[in-house]
Amino acid sequence: MAAFTIYPAVDMRGGKCVRLLQGDYNKETVYGDSPVAMAEQFAAQGAEWIHMVDLDGAKEGRRVNDRFVIEAARRLSVHVQVGGGIRTEEDIVHYLENGVARVILGSAAISDPPFVKKMLQKYGRRIVIGIDARDGFVATEGWLATSNVKAEELGRMLAEAGAETFIFTDIATDGTLSGPNIAAAVRLAEATGKEVIASGGVSSLDDLRALCQYAGQGIGGAIVGKALYTNQFTLAEALKVVNER
């Protein structure tokens, strides 16, 4: 059976654990004062991976909340992947040398494709490509801008450059609990022939069951945020759904 991983999300802004609605920095809900404590909680509930996002970093184009990511990576016996504000090789090395398992390159994939290709060649599977799309087109700079590049086009180009894993976020559904855009995630998996982790909109165990059905077609997991924070289901229940399929 194809693997399927649940990635609980810890989004950080101003040193706190927050969620944004559809990536809107003006629509923020604070869910905790300590991102590390939140990550610790998910690890205690059985998570194998934690997905951490530096929202300040994504907006400012530099590392801002990195100390929390590194503390979580060093302290917890789970894999940590991080995105947000990673623009240079120094950023990548800073995380990878301090215990982080994978770094996510997002905006750089549009603004500097040669750099991303070079990093893929150098660091291989430890680089994950984050493709965030609005109406099928790739969004950048903490979702504040939309490009004229289609998600599948960018995916194909980077798969050819060596990308093995993509995180696909449908901005329209992110933080809305309205159900994930499964079709768009599957299209990206088909276009690239690589693993795609679906992000945005997961609201119920049924959403996870639906995503799991595509595990054999390249959907390798789901990032779950707001549903866990608003008690739609527990991480234990989510893991049970995945393990029982």
Curated annotation (Swiss-Prot):
Record gene name: hisA
Enzyme class, broadest EC rank: isomerase
Q: Name one GO biological process term.
A: L-histidine biosynthetic process
Assigned protein family: Belongs to the HisA/HisF family.
**Catalytic reaction annotation:** 1-(5-phospho-beta-D-ribosyl)-5-[(5-phospho-beta-D-ribosylamino)methylideneamino]imidazole-4-carboxamide = 5-[(5-phospho-1-deoxy-D-ribulos-1-ylimino)methylamino]-1-(5-phospho-beta-D-ribosyl)imidazole-4-carboxamide
- Per the UniProt record, which EC number(s) apply here? 5.3.1.16
Which positions are tagged coiled coil?
none
Which pathway does the UniProt entry assign to this protein?
Amino-acid biosynthesis; L-histidine biosynthesis; L-histidine from 5-phospho-alpha-D-ribose 1-diphosphate: step 4/9
**Where is this chain primarily localised?**
cytoplasm
Highest taxon above the source species:
Bacteria
Q: According to its record, what are the GO cellular component terms?
A: cytoplasm
- GO MF annotations for this entry? 1-(5-phosphoribosyl)-5-[(5-phosphoribosylamino)methylideneamino]imidazole-4-carboxamide isomerase activity
- What is this protein called in UniProt? 1-(5-phosphoribosyl)-5-[(5-phosphoribosylamino)methylideneamino] imidazole-4-carboxamide isomerase
Q: Which UniProt keywords apply?
A: Amino-acid biosynthesis, Cytoplasm, Histidine biosynthesis, Isomerase
According to its UniProt entry, this protein's organism is Geobacillus kaustophilus (strain HTA426)
Localization annotation: Cytoplasm
Q: Which InterPro entries does the record associate with it?
A: Aldolase_TIM, His_biosynth, HisA_bact_arch, Isoase_HisA-like, Isoase_HisA-like_bact, RibuloseP-bd_barrel
Q: Which residues form the active site?
A: D11, D132
Q: Which Gene3D superfamilies match?
A: Aldolase class I
